[in-house]
Amino acid sequence: MLNNPVEGERYLAEPRAVILAPTRELVMQIGEDARELGKFTGLSTVTLIGGADYAKQLQKVNQRVTDIVVATPGRLIDFLQRRDMFLDRVESLVLDEADRMLDMGFIPQVKRIVRSTPKKEDRQTLLFSATFSPDIMNLASQWTYEPITVEIEPERIATENVDQRVYVLESRDRLNVLKNILATPEATSVIVFANRRDQVRRVHERLQKSGLECGILSGEITQAKRTKTLEQFKSGRLRVLIATDVAGRGIHVDGVSHVVNYDLPEDPEDYVHRIGRTGRAGEKGVSISFASEDNAFLLPEIEALLGQSLKCTQVPVDLVNS
C-alpha cells in the first residue's frame, strides 16, 4: 500500500484493504497489530466487531479516510447493508483462519463480502488456514487468481517449546487438581480451556468461590467485559483465564506459563491451537491435559494429528491432595 499510493481524491468508508477474521478477539488483536505496524506510515485502521456500539464504530469510519478495515464477517455485512461502507476500491483482501470461518458457518457471509470487492484479477487475495481441506481448496480457487501456496513447517505441528503432559484422572477430580496446579509457583500466567460455555462458567464460578481470582472468556460474555478481561490478563492483573476455543482464538499473549485442557478438545486442531498459547517468542511453556473417562477416547485423533504419542501419567501426588 505504501509502494502504491492512491492518486486523486479519496472518500470516506472506502478502505483499501479488508481483513476478515472469525472472532471478535482475533479482530481486535489484528487491529492492534496493524495500528502498531502502521504507526508512522499515515495508514489508518478501523476495527468492526459485533456486540459493540454500531454508532461509535460508524463515527470512527467517518472521522477520516480509512485504509485498513479489520472485521468480523457479520458486522461488515451490517455496514454494507446500510451502505455505510463500500468495498469497490479494495486492493487487498485477507481471509484469516478460513478453516475456522468454514467451521463456524461464516462462509455465506464471506461470499457476500467477496462479491462486493473488485474481481479477483484486480485485487490481491491472501487466504490463511491451518488446514487445506477440499472445501478450503475449493474456496481458494473461487477467490484467488493464480495463487501461490505457501506451507510453513507442516511437520512441526506442536512447538518444541511446550512440555506436553496428559494426566489420567476421574472427571470428578479435575477441579481439585486444577486448583493445585494453579497454586504452584510456576503457574504465573494460565489459560484453562473447556469445550462448552456452561463448563467454562462452572469452572470460573468454583474457582472464584475458592478465593482464586480469574477471568472468563466465552460467547455469552458481553464484548466490553471480554475486552476488559483480556486487557487485564495481558497486563498481568489477572493470572488465570478460563476460555472456550472460539473466544480463546484471539489470545496472543507472550509469557503464558501454562495451558490447561480441562476438557480434551473434540477437534484435534483445537488442541494444537490451545497449546500454541504458551511457549511463544522462544519461551518455554507447559500444557496439561486432563484425560478422564468422559474424553480419553479423543486422544488417538490428537496423537495422529501431532504425529507422535502423548505420554499419559497418573496425577502427581502433590497435585492430588486437597
Give short role names for the model-derived ranges:
Residues 1-322:
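Conserved helicase RecA-like core
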